[in-house]
C-alpha cells in the first residue's frame, strides 16, 4: 500500500538526493524491483468536506467521521464486500477489528499533527 505522499521521497531517492526525515511520505522505490515489498501497513486518506478519515489495509477499510469518530464510523471487509455495502462497525463480532483501527487512527492523526509544514 502506498500514498500520494510517497511520490516525493521516492523520486528524491531515485535521483540520489538525501532523505528528508521531516516528510510524511516514504521511499517506495524498492517496490519497483520487489512488488511484494511493503512500506506501510495501511494507507491513510482524508475527505475534508465530510471530515472523514480513512485507513485502508489489504482486507479492510475503516472510515471515521470527526477527529474522534463522533460523527460515525464505518468498517468494511473489502475482500468479501468490495463495494462496501455492509457496514460492520456496529457488529459485536467485529469489535476487536474496530478497536484496532480506532487505535491506529488515533496514532495516525497524532503523527500527522507533527508534519513537515511545522518544521
Regions found by a protein language model. Give the residues of each.
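C-terminal cap/loop subdomain of S1 sulfatases and analogous C-terminal strand-loop tails that border
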Residues: 5-8, 13-74, 78, 83, ...
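Phosphate-coordinating loops and pocket residues in cytosolic domains that bind phosphorylated ligands
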Residues: 87-90
